[in-house]
Amino acid sequence: MASPRTVTIVALSFALGLFFVFMGTIKLTPRLSKDAYSEMKRAYKSYAKALPALKKMGVSSVLLRKIIGTLEVGCGIVLTLVPGRPKDVANFILLLVMLAVLFFHQLVGDPLKRYAHALVFGILLTCRLLIARQAEDRPEREERREEQINAQEKNKVKVS
């Protein structure tokens, strides 16, 4: 039977992956929801206006939206389907994207209800990453503990 930690990581990875594939697709195409796509276009225009440095670098609102949408779709697919270390990398990239999105929302002065999802999913990504890292560190700690116990037993003096 799988450990609770493994079940948690798999469930979080799958759910987060599907969410980011969905949200990234909404940013890239109006096929899923024309209203949501239009709202994304409007929001990213306001983000680009609030950051004139992006315009100086040649990053338009369309390019910014497509970059973030593509990152979300790509990393979402990795979180959903790819096993191993790439999930942690995708998780970290998505965490950075969520931080950028939170920054954009704060920059334009959006109310909390507009960016609460980014906050929640940022927390979930952080939890998933911490749980995954904790699971990897545990066998090493147990081995070190066993070595310390063995060393202590060898150093004990038998009293007769």
Curated annotation (Swiss-Prot):
Q: Where is this region: Disordered?
A: 137-160
Its principal location? membrane
Give residue ranges on the Lumenal side. Answer: 27-61, 110-113
Location of this chain's protein in the cell: Peroxisome membrane; Cytoplasmic vesicle; Endoplasmic reticulum membrane
Gene Ontology molecular function terms on file: acetylcholine receptor regulator activity
Q: Which cysteines are joined by disulfide bonds?
A: none
Identify the keywords attached in UniProt to this record, alphabetized.
Answer: Chaperone, Cytoplasmic vesicle, Endoplasmic reticulum, Membrane, Peroxisome, Transmembrane, Transmembrane helix
Please give a single GO biological process term from the UniProt record: positive regulation of protein localization to cell surface
Q: Which GO terms describe its cellular component?
A: cytoplasmic vesicle; endoplasmic reticulum; endoplasmic reticulum membrane; peroxisomal membrane
Q: Say if the entry is tagged with keyword Chaperone.
A: yes
Cytoplasmic side residue ranges read: 1-5, 83-88, 132-160
InterPro entries, alphabetized = TMEM35A/B
Membrane topology value? Multi-pass membrane protein
Transmembrane portions of the chain = 6-26, 62-82, 89-109, 114-131
**Belongs to which family?**
Belongs to the DoxX family.
Role: Molecular chaperone which mediates the proper assembly and functional expression of the nicotinic acetylcholine receptors (nAChRs) throughout the brain. Essential for the proper folding, assembly, function and surface trafficking of alpha-7 (CHRNA7), alpha-4-beta-2, alpha-3-beta-2 and alpha-3-beta-4 receptors.
Protein's name in the database: Novel acetylcholine receptor chaperone
